[in-house]
């Protein structure tokens, strides 16, 4: 039995939700990609492009953004790590979308541009109803909220 988990917010899940942090999504482009000198990447520019789709549930956050804007890239589903996605983009095999937290501290030869309009994934804690949680789980959630607030 699982009491709680850290996740990105999913609308279809009927669990209690504790928001912790917004994590901005970025366009990941090859180093030689010509974005016309713009400092942002219009979401609609993904339309019709070879798009390397990250795996392990992150695709849900990305599909939400693409669907909201009616964008249909040529999705290539992958079962590889974020590092491999970045390397594939670096070598011109497509474009992708990843989050700031995934890219934090990396020194890759790709362009990482904010999306226009801005898009984020809301990170937090999904749990069974709070009234059903054991006291130590409620305390853990409170500590996590406090710790993230201080960051």
Task: State each model region's role.
Residues 15-17, 22-27, 31-33, 43, ...:
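Small-molecule pocket liners
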Residues 1-25, 29, 37, 89-93, ...:
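Short beta-strand-centered segments that line the small-molecule binding cleft or hinge
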Residues 113-151:
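A late-sequence structural motif
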Residues 1, 8, 57-111:
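Hydrophobic hinge/microswitch elements
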Residues 35, 49-70, 133-141, 151:
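Secondary-structure junction motif
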Residues 12-13, 32-42, 117-119, 130-136:
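Short helix-loop capping/hinge motifs at secondary-structure junctions, enriched
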């Amino acid at each position: 039995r699982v009491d709680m988990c850290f996740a990105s917010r999913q609308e279809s899940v009927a669990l209690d939700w504790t928001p912790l942090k917004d994590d901005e999504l970025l366009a990941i482009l090859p180093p030689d990609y010509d974005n016309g000198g713009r400092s942002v990447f219009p979401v609609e520019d993904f339309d019709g492009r070879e798009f390397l789709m990250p795996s392990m549930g992150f695709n849900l956050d990305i599909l939400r953004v693409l669907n909201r804007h009616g964008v249909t890239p040529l999705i290539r589903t992958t079962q590889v790590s974020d590092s491999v996605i970045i390397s594939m983009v670096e070598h011109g095999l497509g474009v992708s979308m990843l989050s700031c937290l995934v890219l934090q501290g990396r020194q890759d030869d790709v362009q990482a541009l904010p999306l226009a309009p801005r898009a984020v994934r809301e990170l937090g804690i999904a749990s069974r109803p709070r009234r059903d949680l054991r006291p130590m789980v409620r305390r853990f959630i409170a500590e996590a909220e406090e710790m993230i607030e201080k960051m």
